[in-house]
Amino acid sequence: MNKRRVFFGFFMLIFFCRALFCYDGVMAGQNNIKIARTEYFDIIYAPGSEKSAEVLYENADGIFTELSNLFGLLHTFRLPVVISPSQDEFNAYYSSAPFSHIVMYDTVPPESFAVFSETLLSTFCHELIHAVTYNLHNNFWTAVKKIGGDAYNPALLTITSGWAEGASVSVESSGGEGRLNSEYHKQLVRQAKIEGKFPRFSEVQGARDVYPSGQLSYYFGGAFSAFLQQKYGMEKYARFWYKCVNFQTLTYFGCFKKVYGFPIQDAWEEFYDSVEVPDVSCDPAEEDWCAALTAGGKNGNLKNVSLVCASEEGAAFYDADSASVKYACFGRGKTGGSFEEGALSRAKTVCTQNDVSRLNISSGGELLAVSYTSLSGRVPKNKIRIINTKTRRSFTLKESGIRDGTVFFADGKWYLAAVKTHSQYCTLNLYSLTEGKNGSVKKAVLVRQKKFGFGKGVFSPSGSSSGRVFYILKDGMEYTIRAFSALQDETEWTVPLPEKDMVIQTVNVRAGADGTERLAFSFTRPGTIPRLALLSADISGRKADFSLSTRDSSGGIFSPSCVSGKKYVYSAHFFESNAIFTADLQKMTFETYSVRISEFAPGLQNAAALSAVSPLPQAVSSGTQADSPFPEFSSASKPFSPAKYAFSGPHGTFVPFALTQSYVIKKSADALEAVLVPFGISYITGTPWTYPLFGFSAGFNPLTESAALLAGIYGGTPQTELLSYYALLQVEFDLDGYKQAYGALNVSSKIALGGRTYLSFLQNAQIFEGRQGLIEIPENSEKFFGALKSDDETHRVLFTDRTSAGLGTIKKSGKGFYDYSGVELSAVYMQNWCACVSEPSYEYDGYQNIGLDFTAKNSALLPLFAEVFLFPSKSYFLGALAECVFLTKEIQKSTVKMPFLYANRFTLSGYYMGKFTHGWRTYMDSWSVLDTADYMRYLCEGDFYYYDEACLSASFMLTPNIGGLSRPAFRFELKAQFFYRQHPDPDQNHYSASICGITVF
């Protein structure tokens, strides 16, 4: 084999990967990216985000100046801001690695996050607050960053996510908008106090890894920061941040005491006292108008349900823990319950779907629209599937970018109305549905389209059998209820809200027998918990009557649906879970208001000439006509080159050690061992949207008397599991010249096929060529320099590859941390090839085989895990593993005396593992899978060696509650294990024990 050809081919493969994935991450699939520079920002945007980029171009510098003055920023800085319309899931983030940058997902926020009049600018402000607060550095740390890079930030050692998000949420809400001025978002803090589960200050810093997990940092951190700013002033709050980010104290609680003069727990108690809650029972079922809704069967308790919708025939609900959409009919089930008694028949799973955002059922319960976020592509995309509740057959619209679907039957036809989003624009789409023979939907055709201006939000459309579609329109901070007819002319109607400060969510409509439309939705006034609102709309009479409930209840009222003239079903949100209840209107008290319905005809666009997959307009004014970009912005926009940007200017981080290693082939000739070549320097850079990351390293080791150069790339699709990859090349030299070269390529992918089923792929390839050193210093060696050098000048080549492909259904199946269910079957192709290049007459070692791996998980009684593998390596031909979690105790606590440590859970588990070999310490031949029948015969005849191991383990899962480590992604597991081996390996004992710590990140 020609080694030059081998390495040239491997280099071209890595180069091809770099070119192929240059636009991965949030810019996946984007071309013609542009950049517009302001005084402080590089605004980088993709086609489709021109208007959003223009808005930032005009306002970003002013927001930065305002925040700099607020926090007393000493040293200004320049920051890239990336705007991408690729994905439909609203979000944004700031990161200082490998250099400071902000990434914004340019899409309309969901209904639950409609808390700003100008969402784009307010979201940018939120992330810019992170950038400003994390960079409140003095002269010393500013100089360190200029030399080493933005990642040298001591705030990462002191500031937790509770403080980081607290600063952003509190400041974004200081102007009267934002989450702290939304009663829906204040609900979590109030609910914790109502239930007596108010957490300590050390328990909201980001370490909690069960629901409500990450929400605590935003809501409790934001409310606490706002409390400090309002009571003790912004100057002290900014000084606290300044001391933390300049590492003037080791911990945030030590810094707090220095700045404020008293312990943080005292301030937290004051904050607790300041939280106002209504005088209600923690259990809403104690109210005379409320009853818990249950379903028949063993799992009839509906306490972990996040979404609900109901018709006159039944109710559908979503269990996010098991990703199951379930449906149950009203009336007498196997338990003898009826709806009047607050019960459903036995619930059946109609589909399995992750990340469901809304459920909407037709008035007769025949069809169910499931709006969800698909993670099967490069970026998250909003999709809608329609399910027949009787046959469970489903139809998924090919179009993406659509959400908040509602399905209804009118004038002999089925229709679907949905909101399509692109950048900061909404379009209300109406589809005509065609049924198949079995009653399921087989086709959807776009028939009408209503366009809205930049920044206007359209939420929760709901269609009735009258043919009218009602929806919520948010313009700035003003809410109205709108309606249009799917059957008649282009007339639209507007129903104004009776009070200016009302905020509403989740409209559900049913047509009344008297020709009126009856709507149910939740609403808030300033200072209230979400309540029930009813609307009777007489379109022909141009009159609407509101009935607003007057009392708060624990958990609030979310997603109410009418099931009869007297009863409504709704979801209540508690601190640690959600539950479904029924409300009896006859026992509730309401305030009534009457308003006039206005009629207008703006012109719904008939879609006869439209295609369901045609792109939406990308620059639409507040009316309906396209705007030309601002002249100054157009002239400032230039073509953008990711490679040029990454490798020019201070766009990376220097690390004062090397990432290089010196490799040695193991005696088994099928793998490599490594010795660090640590003394040197590394440089890490990437695109302004983080991925891909590029790394370069140069290192030296005096023990090997060698130096190495390394280049690598890491990237993929971080929002989904479609692709993850890394590739690297390394060359090592010593005093004799070229020593060795090493290359590695790792690619993994998981492709969702629908429901629980997925395909998984994994490849891990390595290639080595050259001379080797030593792994350990010889006992008789007296020298330091060159102690790991070898006299063996033989050049060898090693190539290893392990490629697997699997089909599986393993998914989360319950609320428990270890609750997973499903199976997976994988086929693994293994090969390794080792040869002596300097002496071609030597025979080479090679091995190829195919193995099978079957995995099963179930958590019906206890979390169980079982795995059987056939030919997993060349050492043994059959193995099995069974593991059980006997006990899991959720702790989720941190003490006042030890706030730097968060206890997640205690686990007691055990496993049994066994493996069969044919011959003691012998290796199997290539393609031994073809001799499976012979190996099975050896097994039956007892002609094998058997080794086993049983283990009982007790572990505490802990999270460091300091700095950037205070997050579920970084955990420390303290584990005590006892081993028993009936048939031990020759180098093992029958009994052993160990205490160890395992870091997981």
Model-based region annotation:
Residues S668-I684, G695-T717, Y725-L728, Q740-N746, ...:
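C-terminal transmembrane beta-barrel domains of outer membrane proteins
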Residues K303-V308, D355-I361, G401-F408, F454-S462, ...:
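Repeated scaffold domains used in trafficking and secretory/extracellular systems
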Residues P496-Q505, D545-S561, S594-P602:
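Conserved blade-ending motifs and adjacent loop-strand segments that build the rim/top face
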Residues Y23-P154, T160:
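Juxtacatalytic substrate-recognition/specificity segment
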Residues G25-G29, A97-F99, F116-T123, A131, ...:
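Acidic/His/Gly-enriched intrinsically disordered linker/tail segments
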Residues P284, A579, D584-T717, S813-K815, ...:
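Outer-membrane beta-barrel initiation region
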Residues D24-G25, N32-R37, D61, P212-Q215, ...:
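Beta/coil-rich, acidic/histidine-enriched accessory regions frequently appended to metallopeptidases
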